[in-house]
From Swiss-Prot:
Species of the source: Haloarcula marismortui (strain ATCC 43049 / DSM 3752 / JCM 8966 / VKM B-1809) (Halobacterium marismortui)
Family designation: Belongs to the glutamyl-tRNA reductase family.
Functional description taken from the UniProt entry: Catalyzes the NADPH-dependent reduction of glutamyl-tRNA(Glu) to glutamate 1-semialdehyde (GSA).
Biological pathway: Porphyrin-containing compound metabolism; protoporphyrin-IX biosynthesis; 5-aminolevulinate from L-glutamyl-tRNA(Glu): step 1/2
EC category name: oxidoreductase
Record-linked HAMAP family: Glu_tRNA_reductase (MF_00087)
CDD domains with a match to the protein in the record: NAD_bind_Glutamyl_tRNA_reduct
NCBIfam families noted in UniProt: hemA (TIGR01035)
Active site feature: 53 (nucleophile)
Positions contributing to NADP(+) binding: 184-189
Coiled-coil positions: none
Annotated site location: Important for activity: 95
Protein name: Glutamyl-tRNA reductase
List of residues binding substrate: 52-55, 105, 110-112, 116
Amino acid sequence: MRGDTGAIVGVCISHERASVDQLETAAADSERHAVESLLANPAVEEAIALQTCNRTEGYVVVSDHEDGLEALELFTRAVPDDVVVEMGHEESLRHLLRVAAGLESIVLGEDQILGQLRTAYETARGVGGIGPMLEDGVTKAIHVGERARTETKINEGVVSIASAAVRLLKQESSLTDGTALVVGAGEMGQLAAEALSEEVDRLLVANRTVPHAEHIAESVDIDASALALDGIEAAVSEASAVISATGSGDQVFDIGTFSDSGDVSIVDIAQPRDVPAGADRLPSVTVYDLDALESVTAETRNKRQRAAEAVERIVDEEFDRLLTQYKRKRADRVISTMYESAEQVKAAEINSALSAADFDDEQAEVVEAMADAIVSQILAAPTKSLRDAAEEDDWSTIHTALQLFDPDFGGPDQATPPEFTKGMSVEDIPDGMRDEIPNAMLDRLSDD
């Protein structure tokens, strides 16, 4: 039963352990491509990828943990083992909740990660990556992110990587001549433009799609102009500060871009990076990357620590609820399967009995009522055992029950136990269930 016994396996490569180069290496071409590649693996039932400027994460639902890690080598194979965090089912769920709440971000509590997770969810759902397991996990994470920001002050102050970049430029006195350039017109570019508009007199916005750049230029309350990417070299010569935040797969700048520039400071928060590695060796160019933002975000982190403690409590509370929800759903699915199997056997035996003798309607009702009572009594103890097993995380018992009570088991056309029971002995059945299973079924397993 696809999805009924699977569990989540996840990997995370983030700014906590990985360099900017390693983050760039780990990232797939796109979240969509990553999910499609993961789903191409026959062991993977569900999949989602989350790629931002400071993290690359992948999650799959599989029946075997090692199969999951093998599939997730899509992200991990080209980076050192010590920058990869491997996560099992519960670790993955808790981590997702923490990510959505902003507890794992460079800027503690920043808002953008919640939108990025929503986008990753919609992307994965669009290509068939979201099933019941990830549906519950990711939507719960989004709910936690919303609670964190409405019930605490986790996102007060510097609230984005873009605003942290502006603060860094201000600290380094790079905003003194009044002109700044933003490259990229996505959400991060919009935030950078808004933050810069409070510090400079003139803003240039460059983007591959000029109308998008025009939209940002029109949204700020200072002198602002939009331009295409082929006008970047001229724009750099006018600006003393640049924030680059495109989602381009190609580098936007080259060394020649800075040939006519004066002193310019660039914060490159794109993933992959927009600025070539050798640019910071030019005497007039200073390049800052995500690592440089740590000094700016440390102050914000300290201010938000009390709020973070409240968010941790929200995460703990919602995590416990999520686990209970998973356990209840999985136990209910197995119990439903068990009852379906019993109903098939009951219906077949009633039909056989009623056709073999001349029962009137009242007698037939008595036979059917007796059969219902027998099924209920037989399954009462296994039902309790399954619910107890779910509460105690005893998934081996639940998996055995799924095999034993497969809907095809005991069907009228089946004279022998189905294929899945080959190699299974009576001793493999949990004690609480074995005592309640009809001897005929046990004999068929023993004979096989």
